[in-house]
Amino acid sequence: MIVEVPRNTVLQGHVLDKLRDLPNDCVDVVVTSTPYYGLRDYGPDCVSVWDGKADCEHEWVTREYLMHNGRGDCQKSAKFSSQRDEGVNYPDEPKADKTCLKCSAWKGQLGLEPHPSMFIEHLAQVFLEIKRVLKPSGSLWLNLGDTYFGGNGQYGRPEGWKDLENDKLSGHAPGEFIKERNKLRSNWLQPKQKMLIPARVAIALQDQGWILRNEIVWHKVNHMPESCRDRLTRSWESLYFFVKDDKYYFDLNAIRNPHQTNCGSGTRKISQTQKFSKTSCFNGGTTSYNAMGANPGDVWALTNEGLKEEHFAAFPQKLVKRILSCSAPKGGLILDPFAGAGTSLLVAHKMGFDWLGIELVPKYCKIIEKRIERHGKIRLDGFMLSTSSEIERKQPCVE
């Protein structure tokens, strides 16, 4: 049975459910920025269910229930200390996340899991499905910011976290923390620690078979100031360029930087090749001059763009344009599984590509709709907001 792939559409719902509705090898490029870990509470509209069993009649309980009534190792994931460091601005107890007593499913916001290992596992589930729907010639571009432990974020409770430092998320029972004491104690969850969440996610994707081609530094030229006094201000984020096969579409010439040459009168003509002499390190030879421009490298300095609509973080359109210019073939389908305010979809729309978004929050879907409407000359009649799918359901990929 041939399954028609939706195009120029926003699918509203759980990202895993919507991805599993898509057929294999149907997307050319994935451009996305996932929720960052432990930084922001987006409200009850962003709550979803992860892990556990789909047919379970869930019996939800809070962390406090698990802590006071005991639930094996789940007790550890529920424990937060009442002790607080002086000088740290702790928020009120956030994230009314819950656990199912029957199947250990977890109900909460992606990015507000009680332990970073659970967050990484949830993202790994998503990107395994993305790997299935991505064409062999396709690519994944993932932006993810980092988090400091014990600061002003939602999870700034160092003492409570120290009990989790040796807990390991295991696949024996979905959603449960299985206690596995390490011979050497790992104390990486300490106050003021930069958690390296993007790197940990990237390694998890490599374990799935993804091929990491570049870690690009997105230098935010007009980055936000910070009030910290004992470290440097953050001015960049990671942008990972992944592929699923060693033969993939990539057009470097489309994003080359023009040569900055200003030859006035009396200047010698520049040769397209230049010889270099033999040294102790090199055997000598020639280096080529590409008339189309220079390789832009892996540090991209781009200015953040303001957004009138209510959304906390949005891609710069120039960043998405550069990505699609080098990685999207003519007539390609662009997917953003965490569409947010829809910047990647909007840029794809402007550039004449087909696009597909997935977004959990209805009000963000409305924002996307309004932004696309402003540029409706291309293909507005193809836009629809889909809250349900009649596409043949695909089983999740297991590796």
Feature names for model-found ranges:
Residues 1-247, 254-255, 261-399:
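S-adenosyl-L-methionine-dependent nucleic acid methyltransferase catalytic domains
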